[in-house]
Amino acid sequence: MNSGGGIVAAAAPSSGGGNVEWHVRPPNPKNPVVFFDVSIGGIPAGRIKMELFADIAPKTAENFRQFCTGELRKAGKPLGYKECQFHRVIKDFMVQSGDFLKNDGSGCMSIYGHKFEDENFTAKHTGPGLLSMANSGPNTNGCQFFITCAKCDWLDNKHVVFGRVLGDGLLVMRKIENVAIGPNNRPKLAVVITECGEM
């Protein structure tokens, strides 16, 4: 999934990660849990709670966590996902967000600077509700991410999986997945992260 709008379609052979079903793996109590409160067309849609796989991909998880909490600041203002939109939705595939710079899929930055490397491909896209980094090729991770709506194994070894949606957050994800879309798979109603943080 290219953060600029294209989709990586080539399959890669699966390696590592064993037979773990990452979307239903038992939670690790040491991993951070973050949340998004989401609105659709200005109407509250619910909360998405997410476990970040700091035990598997600590650098990627920390990048996402800090954009949830707003710890990173520029000129005294928090940088992160609050007021960011889900700019790309493809039913039965994924919902994409994280471009708080431009809200159109072209913005890129990380807590480490501009882009950072693919940490590892240990976790796989085994089912719905997995958090994975959007990119424009190898080692181009920034702030954009997507949540899987189904198994997407053709993305394995190309996109870094770093967390998963917990519990009822999947219902909110399904609401986002089912919004009407216009050109470039952009929702016709604004889907906005109204609040975010760490639990």
UniProtKB/Swiss-Prot annotation:
Gene3D superfamilies: Cyclophilin-like. The keyword Chaperone applies. PPIases accelerate the folding of proteins. It catalyzes the cis-trans isomerization of proline imidic peptide bonds in oligopeptides. Its EC number is 5.2.1.8. This is Peptidyl-prolyl cis-trans isomerase CYP22. Ubiquitous. It comes from Arabidopsis thaliana (Mouse-ear cress). Residues 35-198 form the PPIase cyclophilin-type domain. One of its GO terms (cellular component) is plant-type vacuole. GO terms for molecular function: peptidyl-prolyl cis-trans isomerase activity. It catalyses: [protein]-peptidylproline (omega=180) = [protein]-peptidylproline (omega=0). Disulfide bonds: none annotated. The gene is CYP22. Belongs to the cyclophilin-type PPIase family.
